């Protein structure tokens, strides 16, 4: 059965893709979002759901989870004209009569126009690289923190020395029974002020040590074996939960198959966010142009222009004058 052709398909369900979908709904067109992850929200939802964000207009501060929740709630107004496809990776798209054929790892989709809002691409956590690590993952070994309360009263070990590792350690200090940070260097890569707070806290710091083995029963890790760098000293740390904060690697590996002009991992666009292929637009971190500032707020501003240009492309004979939302929603 042939999939119906949507007006606009948005590749990427992060903050910019979600707002673009909302604005497209506001303009009265049908929208499909294709997201490679198992949930919407992109990096704010997955990587820093409980960290504060300070550069979203009209919000003095809010967490990544709150930002995602607000965007999904905003989009729900147009759920009757919005379709969401999760855990689908866009492999290729081709120009066909009436629009584009979009092939993913699961299906073939059809769209009259495309807006690419996939950020820097798919991302995956950098792991410890230890045997049996995968067995414990998502049970009591975590690569990102969704809820701080889940660690209440626990012995928590954090591996890493960057901003995320230090921030989580400080955030968990008053929640967990104990917090231990293991880092391979004596110096931390985090912001100086955060490091000062860490050193003045009750968090246990073990440097320079590297993880060597995990011990546990079933799917639960019980001990992390660490070794001092360039020495034979070995320690076994008892734990209830282990947080691995080595960062994430990103990849736009399929970009080369999309037949678009790009630089590094971003797509070259015009001032109207048109890519090198007519009918395909790019916004957010996926888009590259002179003077680009990679902020969520920037992407929010790019979304309406891209949506309006997509509508002009699809319906060139329609009266496409932009109307303020106060005139469209009661």
From Swiss-Prot:
One of its GO terms (molecular function) is ferredoxin-NADP+ reductase activity. FAD binds at residues 35, 43, 48, 90, 123, 285, 326. Its cofactor is FAD. It is an enzyme of class 1 (oxidoreductase). SUPFAM superfamilies: FAD/NAD(P)-binding domain. Binds 1 FAD per subunit. Keywords: FAD, Flavoprotein, NADP, Oxidoreductase. Disulfide bonds: none annotated. Its EC number is 1.18.1.2. It comes from the Bacteria. It holds the Pfam family Pyr_redox_2. It catalyses: 2 reduced [2Fe-2S]-[ferredoxin] + NADP(+) + H(+) = 2 oxidized [2Fe-2S]-[ferredoxin] + NADPH. Belongs to the ferredoxin--NADP reductase type 2 family. Homodimer. This is Ferredoxin--NADP reductase.
């Amino acid at each position: 059965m042939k999939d119906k052709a949507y007006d606009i398909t948005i590749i990427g369900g992060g903050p910019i893709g979600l707002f673009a979908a909302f604005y497209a709904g506001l303009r009265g067109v049908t929208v499909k979002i294709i997201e490679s992850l198992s949930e919407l929200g992109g990096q704010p939802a997955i990587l820093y759901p409980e960290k504060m964000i300070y550069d979203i207009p009209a919000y003095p501060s809010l967490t990544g989870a709150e930002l995602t929740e607000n965007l999904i709630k905003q989009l729900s107004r147009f759920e009757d004209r919005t379709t969401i496809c999760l855990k689908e990776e866009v492999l290729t798209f081709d120009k066909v009569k009436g629009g584009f054929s979009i092939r993913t790892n699961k299906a073939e989709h059809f769209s009259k126009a495309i807006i690419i809002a996939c950020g820097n691409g798919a991302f995956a956590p950098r792991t410890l690289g230890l045997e049996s690590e995968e067995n414990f993952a998502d049970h009591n070994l975590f690569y990102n923190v969704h809820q701080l309360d889940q660690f209440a009263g626990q012995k928590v070990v954090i591996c890493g020395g960057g901003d995320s590792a230090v921030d989580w350690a400080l955030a968990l200090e008053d929640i967990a029974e104990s917090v231990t940070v293991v880092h391979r260097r004596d110096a931390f890569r985090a912001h100086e002020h955060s490091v000062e707070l860490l050193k003045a806290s009750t968090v246990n710091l073990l440097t320079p040590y590297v993880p060597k083995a995990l011990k546990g029963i079933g799917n639960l890790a019980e001990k992390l074996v660490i070794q001092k760098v360039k020495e034979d000293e070995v320690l076994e740390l008892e734990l209830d939960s282990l947080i691995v904060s080595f960062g994430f690697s990103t990849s736009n590996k399929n970009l080369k198959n999309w037949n678009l002009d790009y630089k590094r991992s971003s797509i070259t666009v015009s001032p109207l966010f048109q890519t090198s292929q007519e009918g395909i637009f790019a916004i957010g971190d996926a888009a590259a142009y002179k003077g680009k500032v990679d902020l969520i707020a920037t992407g929010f501003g790019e979304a309406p222009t891209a949506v309006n240009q997509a509508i002009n492309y699809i319906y060139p004979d329609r009266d496409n004058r932009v109307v303020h939302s106060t005139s469209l929603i009661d």
